[in-house]
Amino acid sequence: MLDITDITKQFPAVRALDGVSLEVESGEVHGVIGENGAGKSTLMKILAGDVAPDEGRLLVDGEATRFGSPREAIDAGVVLIHQELSLADNLDVGANILLGREPRTGPFLRRAEATSRATAAL
């Protein structure tokens, strides 16, 4: 479960988020909509580990956390699918799905597991 409470983010000219709260159960998929400047992108960047909140609490499975990087968010199971979806034209569908999260043992790709995970995602 992902639980954010009273998240606030201030930039020099604007308060982008002011006490935002959201709860997402494991396995749920949510879309965020709103007017330009409403703070959607800032909230997503905080959840994805791109930006740190100024205030508020972020819990993943009941444990307080602050993501220092997108890799930390992904490792915690928080994945952001950007609105401007960019695919690697030279990769197949499965490779695009797992891009950056390929199952590996050292430098070697575990192909059977990769195929299984990509198929499950479809």
Describe the residue ranges of each PLM region.
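Glycine-rich phosphate-binding loops of nucleotide-dependent enzymes
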Residues: 1-122
